[in-house]
Amino acid sequence: MAADPIHQFQITKLFTLGHIGGQEIAFTNSSAYMFLSVGVISLLMIGGMAGRQLVPGRIQSVAELSYEFVAGIIRSTAGKEGMKFFPLVFSLFMFIAVSNLIGIIPYTFTVSSHLIVTVALALLVFVIVLFYGLYKNGLKFFKLFVPSGVPVYILPLVVFIEVISFFLKPVSHSVRLFANMLAGHIALKVFASFVGMLGALGFLGWMGAILPLGLTVAVTALEILVAFLQAYVFTILTCIYLNDAMHPGH
């Protein structure tokens, strides 16, 4: 492993696809792991649902549990009407969860540890919420910025705050995922580096490496939990925003 804990987040060019307007278009390790994540998801869902059995096997169970888990989030947060967005929400959950899990494997790349990726996902949700809200509700969509029961004399201030918070949603939506994955992987790399450095000192070093080794195992287990938790948080926030677009006055 490289000594620098930030080295694992470096984007490297694998090959060039060409140039557009003097700007090089390259296929990077980040692109490769995005394709890998999509491939793993495709194999899981296609392999799990092909030749379905009454008593599901392991792959079928994972596929069905993933489907029901996301469907349950949508129904509880956005109601039955929100199921029209199931393909979007399910794709986001699976992509983030699988990308996070792949990133835990040593010598791999964590796609969600880069802000540009999480911002792109958050902006996708934001644009869909904005345009669908306007398409479905017209001008009534702006009721989202006018909470009910607010005294008239402070209503302008509240509306201003609501508008600002609405347009800042992509920031909080993206930074939360990015920061958690970045910090967790840095901590994991630091503890793992301690184990390697102490182990190189011989017997006494290995005795001293027991504590950082235990911490490495603990942080790895925590990162597996965080991988799912961050996918869940991103998904449930997406459902909340979609519910606001469908029912802006609620």
UniProtKB/Swiss-Prot annotation:
GO terms for molecular function: proton-transporting ATP synthase activity, rotational mechanism. It is a multi-pass membrane protein. PANTHER family: ATP SYNTHASE SUBUNIT A (PTHR11410:SF0). InterPro entries: ATP_synth_F0_asu, ATP_synth_F0_asu_AS, ATP_synth_F0_asu_bact/mt, F0_ATP_A_sf. GO terms for cellular component: plasma membrane; proton-transporting ATP synthase complex. It comes from the Bacteria. Belongs to the ATPase A chain family. This is ATP synthase subunit a. F-type ATPases have 2 components, CF(1) - the catalytic core - and CF(0) - the membrane proton channel. CF(1) has five subunits: alpha(3), beta(3), gamma(1), delta(1), epsilon(1). CF(0) has four main subunits: a, b, b' and c. Keywords: ATP synthesis, Cell inner membrane, Cell membrane, CF(0), Hydrogen ion transport, Ion transport, Membrane, Transmembrane, Transmembrane helix, Transport. Key component of the proton channel; it plays a direct role in the translocation of protons across the membrane.
